[in-house]
Amino acid sequence: MTQITFPQAGHLTALPPLSLYIHIPWCIKKCPYCDFNSHSLKNGLPEAAYIDALLTDLQLELPNIWGRPVETIFFGGGTPSLFQAESIDRLLSGVRSLLRLQPEAEITLEANPGTFEIEKFQGFKDAGITRLSIGVQSFNDDMLARLGRVHNGKEALTAIATALKLFDKANIDLMYALPNQTVQTALDDVQTAIATGATHISAYHLTMEPNTPFGHTPPKGLPQDEAALDIEDAVHGALEGAGFIHYETSAFAKPTMQCRHNLNYWQFGDYLGIGAGAHGKISYPDRIERTVRRRHPNDYLALMQSQPSKAVERKTVAAEDLPFEFMMNALRLTDGVPAAMLQERTGIPAAKIMAQIETARQKGLLETDPTVFRPTEQGRLFLNDLLQCFL
């Protein structure tokens, strides 16, 4: 890429919206396909100590975000719903005392459909959670067993019904291209999810990630590429036919029900990440900084009790890397983003990367409208090829 230089300090005329990500790293059992920072429960759940550590972590970051309003919060994992509602309440009370949390903030918590967690849903709402994201993956018990999940289809339906009674917004996570899955069995999952009345459905292609059991030994019966593409087309078509807007690579929402937290990621907004292994991105007038917390929960807890600053690594994003990082997020959105947002969020005018933009357009991967960066249908299908234009 052509060498890019920032203007002098003050290149960002305004800071982007700010979100808060909170990582809860424990699960009852780690799934064989999962490459997230999650750890199986072995010796009990150190809830009180971890909440204390999260609040210490947040206090550590206050000078870097002082006075900025927080638009959304997302509890991810791991399985955040393993924590008691009282713990989530204590944490959110601490967050409110430390940050300018917007009155209409979206506050999402990831939950598993086991009956143990369902009993807590009312408590989560009372604590201030406004949206649940339920990790269903499939309603088919055979598929769930192959994926190593600890719930069954009936429990998933009960969890969703309970969530929708309590929350205006609820997401269902589904996976497709599963072992021995056909177009019809994939559609059965999608139609079941649609029938629940969920406002948002995330549909993810099962991938064999390195350093996971499935990555080392893929399960038998995985659909071949062409069959997997047929399944994907059927899944997407069914969701769109039911009135869901396909607004991001894997995300479908009823009108006005998009996940605001994830939209902020994809629009290259800022997010403070706290908790074991959490990543963050914070903009300053003269630079953009990425952060990552110590990954293992035991190490994170120990450092937060003794030397909190040593639990955090900080790195300024090189100016020449910013266009790719911006596009890597923005081009996941079906409608793309306004072209002016590149300069607003990175300080780099589009003119600096016009050669790369023109290459993407000539390949038919990026629309030619100069006011927007929007992938074509071909660009959405071959997103990696589109992103390669900006490397």
What are these regions (language model features)?
Residues 347-359:
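Short amphipathic alpha-helical interaction segments
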Residues 252, 370-373:
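Short, Lys/Arg-rich nucleic-acid/phosphate-binding segment
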Residues 373-380:
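Basic, amphipathic "hinge/linker" alpha-helix immediately C-terminal to the N-terminal HTH DNA-binding motif
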Residues 4, 10-19, 38-64, 68-348:
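C-terminal scaffold of the Radical SAM
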Residues 380-391:
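Short, amphipathic alpha-helical interaction segments positioned at domain boundaries
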Residues 25-38:
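Local cysteine-cluster metal-coordination motifs and their immediate loop/turn environment
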Residues 20-24:
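Short active-site neighborhood of thiol/selenol oxidoreductases, capturing the structured segment around
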Residues 362-371:
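A short, conserved structural fragment
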